[in-house]
Amino acid sequence: MLRSTKALAAVSVLLVAAIASDAFLIHAAREYFKTTLAIRLDPAGLGAYAGERGTLPKNESPLVFFGDSRALMWKAPDGPMSYRIVNRGVGNQTTAQMLLRLDADMAELRPSIVVLEGGINDLKAIPEFPERRTQIVADCKANLTQIIEACRRAGARVVVVTVFEIGHVSLWRQPFWSKDVHEAVGEVNSYLRTLTRDGVVLFDANPVLTEGKDEVEPAYQVDYLHLSSAGYDALNRQLLPLLRSLPK
């Protein structure tokens, strides 16, 4: 009788685990499907800030954080600033999508400074399309260059942020991952370092985030792609003096 009870309990646990696993997979699949449909409906992500468009005073030229979810999560630095800070980060966007919406955001906001952060959503596709690695990296570089040039033509100074390194990749993600992503991040960052000129400065995030290691410090990450509040605080301690040093 005791054995039967234990066996029944074990089967029950396995059944509950299987149901929970199925529910998780169904939820994940549905969220992915919704994201895919949203991109098809609005490839540039112009709807992300539709409710805020036209609300900024016309006599202001703000400082704009522009990019993907890493920019979206970047809270404004603490401390006095002479600029209003506006965030125009959109989650999941590639540099191609960022480029698509750039003109609309620049025309609306007329920024004095653009803090540009993007590229990881291009590069994280490499494990799924290894045969396109060279083109993915080249397109990422070209799109970031075009964004920088468009910002400069609009009169904005540009702070180019290096692509954040990757955090710890969990065991269950490793089948969908590749060291090629790390190498591509390094390649794009080496290229970004060549783009500095009058009106374009580099903010190298990785010495702060990795502290000399190969991946982002655990305290600075919420997952392998995204930073914690502590990570952004660490970046802001270095970014704020840089922003204050820029000519007006």
Which role does the model predict for each range below?
Residues 66, 71-84, 97-141, 165-168:
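Oxyanion-hole/transition-state-stabilizing segment in secreted/luminal serine hydrolases
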Residues 131-139, 176-187, 223-227:
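Alpha-helix N-cap and loop-to-helix initiation/capping positions
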Residues 115-119, 145, 152, 159-161:
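Conserved, well-ordered alpha-helix/loop/beta-strand core segments that scaffold catalytic motifs
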Residues 1-66, 76, 108-109, 194, ...:
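N-terminal secretory targeting modules
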Residues 40-96, 224, 231-233, 241:
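Mobile, glycine- and charge-enriched loop segments
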Residues 60-62, 83-84, 109-113, 153-159, ...:
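Loop/turn elements at helix/coil->beta-strand transitions in domains of secreted/extracellular proteins
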Residues 168-205:
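Substrate-gating cap/lid alpha-helix
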Residues 98, 201, 219-248:
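Histidine-centered active-site loop/cap adjacent to the catalytic His
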